[in-house]
Amino acid sequence: MNALSPALDLSPALVVLPGPKAGAADGAGSRLLSSREAERLAARGPVVVAHAALTARRLGLQAPPRSRDIFDALELYAFVRPAQFCAPSAAGLAVALGLAEPKGPAAQAQALADVCRMLLGELAETPWPSREEALALAETLSRAGWAWAGAVVTALRSKAVKEGHRGSGLDVWTRVSEWEDQAPPGESGSTPVEPEAARARLAELLVRRGLDEARPAQAEFAAEVAFAFQPREREGEPRMMLAEAGTGVGKTLGYLAPASLWAEANGPAVWVSTYTRALQRQIDRESAALFPDPAVRARKAVVRKGRENYLCLLNFQEAVQAAQLGNGDLIGLALAARWARASRDGDMTGGDFPGWLPTLFAVGPAAQASAANLVDRRGECVHAACPHYRACFIEKTIRASRRADLVIANHALVLTQAAFDGARAARGLKGDIESTALKRIVFDEGHHLFDAADSAFSAALSGAEAAELRRWVRGPEGRGRRGRGLEARLLDLVADREDARKALGEALHAAAALPGEGWSGRIAPPSGEASPIGPVEQFLTAVLEQLRARTSERGGGPADLGQECSARPALELVRATAGKAARALAAVEAPLLALARRLEDLLDDEADALGGAERARIEGALRGLDRRARMLLPAWRAMLQAIEEDAEDDPDFVDWFESNSMFGRVVDAACRRHWVDPTEPLRAAVLSPAHGVLVTSATLADPTLSDPFALAEMRTGAARLPDRPKTLRLASPFDYGKNARAFVVTDVRRDDARQVAAAMRELFLAAGGGGLGLFTAIRRLRAVHDLIARPLADKGLALYAQHVDPLEPGALVDIFRAEADSCLLGTDAVRDGVDVPGRALRLLVFDRVPWPRPDLLHKARRERFGGKGYDDSVARARIGQAFGRLIRRADDRGVFVMLDAAAPTRLFSGLPEGIELRRMGLVEAIEATAEFLGAKATE
């Protein structure tokens, strides 16, 4: 019996794997169950599971609400080990607790029961951060009806505790550390980094990592990229370098070596930017070689994301207050409070927050303790007026990044921050106080820089965006909504300034013309009878009219991608409503600009009287006003005015209309404008102001070109600089001829879902699992999943799928990594985010060539950048990037399969040296896969 929780011994552990295949474990041992037996066990309760919603889905049931009879072990883990990683499955829990990976549902059920006992024992011995604090929250959870509360309270009371009032434990904002002001760091210096010094620093880092010496290619990389850390000689001409380093070269430590030397000699900071969260986390881990002491590392290497990624303590407090009144998920919030107390930086999206936590039970989206509800997504921060300002995770991260040696950021943040700084500089203002100057930048995953720039420097007027602007100005208008409008944020600051109050009132009045509550149902109702309110909704309704008149659904149906058409020539109705919408936006823009000027005057007129808190509030408000009144609204009006005037197309831009669909019906419409070549604003905002820029990736060069870096220069903006960048190309040290195979299957019809599914099923079985299937369309992914999930389960292989399983891609990849014989289906997001070394990923199958989608934007770029050759380059790069996911270590083996007989051989020229592409029938490919990977398993 378990002294900490006798009930646990009486509650069977249930695991349901894809297929479904089920197993249970209790005092009598572990056993396999039929689906019907598993359903009865789940319905009867009490039962221990790992991810209740996913378990129910696999049994064909609805996700259950929380119940005292459903013990989700993942919630117990989140309480006992807050802010610690765990893949959200029974096997993931076992691995997290140091157990061997259990194979099959019965073994996983037994492991699940063992894990729960281990966690309760751990809690009894060493509760974090203190027994009293954990007990306060546990008692609150008990009153809220948490299934685990009895066992948790028993474990915590197994040793003496102080009696008396402990509070709810939910007020985490009173217990997180506060930041302190420090003197400004000053301007960065220009001391160069010598190549030999970079080599020496790399050697030091490798010793700290327990390695004897640098690989020759890694040492060469570190020495060569020191070029990007030399002083620039002329304004607008950065030291720019493009460096391709194949998988296994060790480029991360290779560039951290000179970057750390530059930061030590010159002051803050080198910005290291990535495209994916996975690499951001990896670089953060690698920085431990630079700063082995965790306390020093916390100061010197700071992970920085946009404000919308971090827990807002004021939002959390308001959510707790609402939940205590019955309007929210109090149990989820209590577990989030445990996490917030332990979190390194409060990052809820890709940090140490368990993103699977809000998805375990059937909780309405608006009530979940999720990032969507708890971060500052709407720009409503009141800055110094917030009672939690000194404890704010966002402010702590911002201040830490100002003094750090390394700021580990992402492309989106770096580009939008640079664009904002550029806009302020054009008005003679200093850059944003929320960042240090972007003087030295390393863009890792540089092959994504073009796409990141395309997103950062584009404009989109949609119903959702316009409604968000209305909320930002006017605040929440529906019942039960949380949020703060301009008046709530600023009225007390401008109370004695009549001109500012007048501008504020005019902005509130004008914003009423923007889409309000229920706008989506008015512009695109199921009945088809639109009833728009206001000029912006009328314009969007007209946009939908033009879309219906000129297009058919793209992507095979409205439930997939919606529709798109060129904005010009516009329907007369579109032109007329565009003009009215432009004037409505101008009416919002003018008072916002006036308010910004009044706030700037306030900073100037009362410079000697304003306290630091008041100044911070005003500067924060000005940042929000600048982004909307000086950047967003002018961009929207420019699009609308061009449509109203039916002006000729600007050769530098592509304007188009599109609709977005969900569950088979249109839910939004948008007018979009993108640069044909977004590297022009990239150059102006990011490259030219910088002093040194390193762009690196394992797949930058195109070996089919006479100049392998010509395309990379174009797609990174380097071609727009006065001087050509320095280039470097280092091959992977891996023996791909020995460790990898690449096949094109010639007898599978790619348009026949049954044939594709059969091929993928047999290849996964031949590999014994560890297969990743990549699709270019969600519809085909779902069709294949439905056809192969059960047959794979019958053979003991679990199949997970993006857009099918109710988990975000990162969580699916975590499970895939933890369960070495599982398989995963995904699209681009999975391809770019997969970092799975070892046998867990040993087979990669493409359903077809990943050509770029032939939309209007791609058509314009195709014409600009080389026609068919441009298509080839994009597809070749995607294939190369996917192949790079397959072999991550020198001892990995993997098979790459393309199920598209029409795939041109030229698209595979970017694969590493030593790879021989073979074309063969499916049967031969299955046999070759089994032989190659089977040989590895028996070595």
Model-predicted segments: where are they?
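Conserved pre-motif I regulatory segment
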Residues: 190-243
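Conserved RecA-like P-loop NTPase helicase motor core
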Residues: 733-751, 804-904
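A substrate-engagement module of RecA-like helicase motors
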Residues: 192-204, 268-269, 274-405, 412, ...
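Conserved DEDDh/DEDDy metal-dependent 3′-5′ exonuclease domain
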Residues: 11-123
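A contiguous, basic/glycine-rich beta-loop/short-helix subdomain that forms a polymer-engagement track
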Residues: 371-402, 407, 418-430, 588, ...
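Conserved helicase motor "Helicase C" RecA-like lobe of SF1/SF2 P-loop NTPases
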Residues: 778-803
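Acidic, Mg2+-coordinating catalytic module of metal-dependent nucleases/exonucleases
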Residues: 89-159, 896-898
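Walker A/P-loop
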Residues: 234-258
